[in-house]
Amino acid sequence: MRIGVVGDPDVVVGFRLAGLTDVYEVKSPEQAAKAIEELNSNSEIGLIITTERIGEEIRDTISGVKKVVVEVPDKNGPIVRENDPVKVLVRNAVGVDIK
């Protein structure tokens, strides 16, 4: 199983330095969607990493992907969401609101 990465130049450089080869540097949502589709059609790819911002821009494309997709923060940090599902799960399980 190989890992594919789709991201902006600042994100992909770290993954290239880590030795990943299936890395797509994109500058538009259209390029990102095309790269995600290419990785999804590659049978050797088992995990696709992209940024949260790209994930928000191409949510429909990502929803159709059959592989595991992980969205990581970019250089601007994580996207703050009103109803973060992870926060809700932690609050319900532990009884503590994380900030």
Curated annotation (Swiss-Prot):
Protein name, per record: A-type ATP synthase subunit F
GO molecular function: ATP binding; proton-transporting ATP synthase activity, rotational mechanism; proton-transporting ATPase activity, rotational mechanism
A GO BP entry: proton motive force-driven plasma membrane ATP synthesis
Membrane as UniProt keyword: yes
Assembly with partners or alone: Has multiple subunits with at least A(3), B(3), C, D, E, F, H, I and proteolipid K(x).
Superkingdom in the source lineage: Archaea
Functional note: Component of the A-type ATP synthase that produces ATP from ADP in the presence of a proton gradient across the membrane.
Family affiliation: Belongs to the V-ATPase F subunit family.
Localization of this protein: Cell membrane
Lineage summary: Archaea, Methanobacteriati, Methanobacteriota, Methanomada group, Methanococci
Membrane topology qualifier: Peripheral membrane protein
Gene Ontology cellular component annotations, sorted alphabetically: plasma membrane
Keywords, sorted A to Z: ATP synthesis, Cell membrane, Hydrogen ion transport, Ion transport, Membrane, Transport
Primary site of residence: membrane
